Design a protein with these regions (language model features):
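Conserved short beta-strand edge segments in small beta-sheet-based binding/regulatory domains
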Residues: 68-73
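C-terminal helical cap and adjacent loop that interface with cofactors, partners, or active-site loops
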Residues: 47-49, 62-67, 80-139
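Solvent-exposed beta-strand/loop surfaces of large extracellular or lumenal domains
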Residues: 20, 74-84
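Active-site-lining helix/loop region of Rossmann-like oxidoreductase modules
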Residues: 1-63
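Residues that form or immediately flank small-molecule/cofactor binding pockets and catalytic motifs
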Residues: 32, 74, 97
């Protein structure tokens, strides 16, 4: 594209805004293709509104159903697409402060894009819509 972004990067930006319901959200993306058999991996940098305790962030991820924290950099333990292959869970690691921002957070996330990106996500979205009363469950 003329602005230097790829179509995949623009799609990721637009989808993030759409999912979060924030059309004005300032977000950027860099997408690269690497030779892995399956899976998507994302490096995420977030600037939070308020100061945070890193232990609280890690604890929140640990409590979230469907998320596996894999984060022990001293022992070279962090999520890789191979870890996520054939699994529904999202793997999160490299959870750390972004030293370039006052309330910045960095993390690395991987998932099996066929299992989580398509099939499982569709089921989870449907379940959430039923829970919110947006659609009715067929009995």
């Amino acid at each position: 594209l003329d602005n230097g972004y790829t179509k995949e990067e623009i799609k990721m930006i637009e989808e993030t805004r759409k999912i979060l319901g924030r059309p004005d959200l300032r977000v950027t993306a860099t997408c690269v293709r690497v030779p892995v058999r399956m899976g998507h991996a994302v490096s995420i940098n977030v600037e939070l509104e308020k100061p945070f305790d890193l232990k609280d962030v890690i604890e929140a991820f640990n409590k979230k159903e469907g998320v596996v924290v894999s984060d022990d950099v001293k022992n070279n333990v962090y999520p890789m697409p191979l870890d996520a292959a054939g699994k529904d869970e999202v793997f999160v690691g490299r959870i750390r402060r972004d030293e370039s921002l006052e309330n910045g957070l960095n993390l690395w996330v991987v998932a099996d894009n066929i299992r989580k990106g398509a099939a499982t996500n569709a089921v989870q979205i449907a379940e959430e819509l039923i829970k919110r009363g947006k659609v009715k469950d067929k009995e």
